[in-house]
Amino acid sequence: MPVIHKIHARQILDSRGNPTVEVDVYTESSFGRAAVPSGASTGVHEAVELRDGDKGVYLGKGVLKAVENVNTVIDEALRGMLVTEQEEIDARLLELDGTPNKSKLGANALLGVSMACAKAGAEYSGLSLFRYIGGTMANTLPVPMMNVLNGGAHADNTVDFQEFMIMPIGFSTYSDALRCGAEIFHALKALLHSRGLSTAVGDEGGFAPNLRSNEEAIELVVEAIGKAGYKAGSPASKGGLGDAQVMIALDPASSEFYDTEKKKYVFKKSDKRELSSEEMASYWEGWANTYPIISIEDGMAEDDWAGWKLLTEKIGDRVQLVGDDLFVTNSLRLAEGIEKGVGNSILIKVNQIGTLTETLRAIDLAKRNGYTSVISHRSGETEDSTIAQIAVATNAGQIKTGSMSRSDRMSKYNELLRIEEELGEQAIYPGKQAFRV
């Protein structure tokens, strides 16, 4: 029987040199290990990432309290449970914590245990994790959102918006789409170098040059697509996809530059302009009418529900509008958004909610209500590639896991190559079909 007989956590370092939690789960015949990511721009409604707060050790970012919670309370409570009973394990974790935001034991403690149990269960069952979670119908490789230009909280530059991404949609296989992304990444690097701009990279592996404006950033990406020999799509207002090979996705992370007192969006890093919610929605409408944009994540601030409604009414029929800080992988927040008719997609970050079961329920709720799901990394990552497995397990169709540099990002892309190889002829790359706009 695959009975849990030991759970052990340790403090390791993530891709930014900050502590995070890694968990090992042992049964008599299987083993699972998982490392927990962390974010730079975090939503106020996210589950609590428990940090030690001792400024003299890792600047207060240690996670030894969370580690201790795993090695004592959680280890004792879960010993003897069947590692294959994922829902029961996750329910027990939630019961042990007993708070709505995981603030007692820490979402970082709970998630590490939840994911490691799933991996141990998969090993016991003799299955890949994606097959163990998703069953026989798990066969869809995700279209990647590749973060090639960084700004906002992810980079020390003059760009307000956090991520400018490319999405290779006009391909029949994941491996061809990945090659396209890599070639555009290198074309962009050469383009920046030719203009005397920095090719240093941000937290997620994208370039972080100092540019004159936010518009210059997206125009550089469009130019790089062409330089690499690929065809960008038309603006959303002009038919959008057509024979496009590549489209652009944005994550402005608008909560980061929303002034809650002024109720204005303040472009703090560039021209200092201040926009109302209606003006911000119109700003994005203008961009959608000008550039080949297929997706905008967090185009409005996390609690600006009225602004989100305006944006959805303006461009929600032709642009994927992804809620990250808005929904925080939380089924209750997503249900509220569905009821209010805001957005049409949810970003899925496992550490925003804290357990695998809750993550899968959020994805299911989205699917049942016609919302797409984008499986996502965090800016503070590790070599753990679980999200690649989850993307295929759920047939989500889209993944957001950084640029074509930094091993913490490439580990996910490379894991998807292995999954594609394992699936063989069963592998599906959805391309344009990943979108419902």
Curated annotation (Swiss-Prot):
Cellular location(s): Cytoplasm; Secreted; Cell surface
Cited SUPFAM superfamilies: Enolase C-terminal domain-like, Enolase N-terminal domain-like
Alphabetized GO MF terms: magnesium ion binding; phosphopyruvate hydratase activity
Family: Belongs to the enolase family.
Stated role: Catalyzes the reversible conversion of 2-phosphoglycerate (2-PG) into phosphoenolpyruvate (PEP). It is essential for the degradation of carbohydrates via glycolysis.
Enzyme class (EC, first level): lyase
Cofactor(s) the protein requires to work: Mg(2+)
SMART domains associated with the record: Enolase_C, Enolase_N
Binding site for (2R)-2-phosphoglycerate: Q162, K349, R378, S379, K400
Keywords: Cytoplasm, Glycolysis, Lyase, Magnesium, Metal-binding, Secreted
Pfam families: Enolase_C, Enolase_N
GO cellular component: cell surface; extracellular region; phosphopyruvate hydratase complex
Active site residues per record: E204, K349
Pathways involved: Carbohydrate degradation; glycolysis; pyruvate from D-glyceraldehyde 3-phosphate: step 4/5
Protein name as it appears in the record: Enolase
Positions contributing to Mg(2+) binding: D251, E297, D324
Cofactor binding summary note: Binds a second Mg(2+) ion via substrate during catalysis.
EC number, UniProt record: 4.2.1.11
GO biological process: glycolytic process
